[in-house]
């Protein structure tokens, strides 16, 4: 697997990552993850050099994070990058932002996220991000070592970014 050095760091990230939004399910009408098959996929990806694993709070109805944490537990923590995302639109107040973040760490069974994104930002979510001081909170988590790299995913017109 080809890897690229991340910016001016020693971190090397695989060109392909494993997204955990569409893991195999036990049936067509459920979000329940087929853990045995999904573990095979994680192990195959890892054994073939994939070291970037991407999840989010709501993937698989909330089951993706509790799956991927234990699925990666057998591997040295520094050998892979785990990314998750803050569902800004789900948070009603600043306390909920903190609760969701800490819940994600616990569900993933990690002390930090290598990459942490504000998820699915658009005009409305940007306003909520500001109102709830999400960026300030995440910067604090970064200073505390609970986030290594901070970013966002964006789903709106380019003009919104201006």
Label for each model-derived stretch:
Residues 1-80, 143:
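N-terminal binding-site loop/beta-alpha segment at the start of enzyme catalytic domains
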Residues 12, 24, 61, 88-90, ...:
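Surface-exposed, flexible loop/turn segments at secondary-structure boundaries
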Residues 14, 74, 87-88, 107:
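Proline-rich low-complexity regions
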Residues 14-18, 53-55, 80-84, 113-118, ...:
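Hydrophobic faces of well-ordered beta-strands that scaffold small-molecule active sites
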Residues 22-36, 85-96, 124-127:
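Active-site mouth loops of central-metabolism enzymes
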Residues 59, 75-94, 119:
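Structural motif corresponding to the early beta-alpha repeats
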Residues 91-162:
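Glycine/proline-rich, positively charged
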